[in-house]
Design a protein with these regions (language model features):
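HKD (HxKxxxxD) catalytic microenvironment of the phospholipase D
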Residues: 180-219
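DNA major-groove recognition helix of helix-turn-helix/homeodomain DNA-binding modules
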Residues: 44-59
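HKD-type phospholipase D/PLD-like phosphodiesterase module
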Residues: 141, 146-191
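A short, Lys/Arg-rich alpha-helix, primarily the initiator
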Residues: 1-19, 23
Length: 249
């Protein structure tokens, strides 16, 4: 049985068995066996490869840890929990954004509050993209039934769709940027996800409550844990179904 997750992650990052072997000091044939025979590398090699391909160890080698150990590590991935989004310190949002250098992901319906917290958000996202980070902003399709339903559930009606359209105006400067994608999605959001490299804020959603009044998890990815990776995988699934707001630019 082959490790297709490892193979795909290497291809997406332009890596080969030879290039990886040179970086971590093993024989290329050893790397080949990790792929074709699903052999599990030593912990130090798993950590190095995961960093190279920007994936979690638990995603690349799900059988490397026992269920008990994975559960224990996952608990440590929770840095803290806030009772509501409005309790998350503004400086935390700023720090996470400023420190991110590889991957920034925003999955929301509107997320208009971000531009109030961080007035230079769009300019910072463009700067990060120019420096090599992958930036993905996924907004709810303002014409979708899910956005309409969320507006009804929160008692604000059409205002939810209006929030999406207003948020989109802030992202206009990102039009046509290769590494900064602004897309629409048509999914039911059980959580809004804000990813900054290996840290993440997850705004849970509660029926009948505004997102600002719902709890937030602050997560930090750890080797051997799978909680962060579970939310990261959910983000990627939505991203795969999304479409660009400005596809021809």
């Amino acid at each position: 049985m082959s490790n297709e997750r490892l193979r795909d992650s290497m291809l997406r990052n332009g890596l080969t068995p030879t290039s990886i072997s040179e970086k971590i000091g093993v024989d290329p044939k050893t790397v080949e066996r990790w792929i074709t025979q699903d052999r599990i590398p030593y912990p130090k090699h798993r950590h190095a490869i995961a960093a190279m391909v920007r994936e979690g160890e638990s995603y690349l080698w799900p059988n490397a840890y026992s269920a008990a150990r994975t559960a224990a590590v996952a608990q440590s991935e929770v840095v803290t929990m806030y009772p509501r989004r409005s309790a998350v310190p503004g400086e935390l949002w700023r720090r996470l954004l400023d420190n991110a250098s590889m991957q920034i992901g925003i999955l929301v319906y509107g997320g208009l509050f971000l531009h109030e917290l961080i007035p230079d958000l769009t300019a910072t996202l463009i700067k990060k993209a120019n420096e090599g980070a992958q930036v993905d902003v996924l907004l709810g399709d303002p014409n979708s039934q899910h956005v309409a339903q969320r507006g009804a559930d929160e008692g604000i009606g059409d205002s939810m769709a209006a929030k999406v359209r207003n948020a989109l105006k802030f992202y206009e400067p990102m039009r046509g940027h290769d590494s900064a994608c602004v897309g629409y999605h048509d999914t039911i959001l059980y959580n809004s996800i804000y990813r900054f490299d290996d840290e993440m804020l997850v705004n849970t959603h509660l029926y009948g409550h505004h997102a600002a009044h719902a709890p937030v998890l602050h997560l930090r990815r750890l080797a051997g844990g799978d909680l962060f990776d579970t939310y990261a995988a959910s983000f990627q699934r939505v991203r795969a179904k999304s479409w660009e707001v400005w596809p021809d630019e």
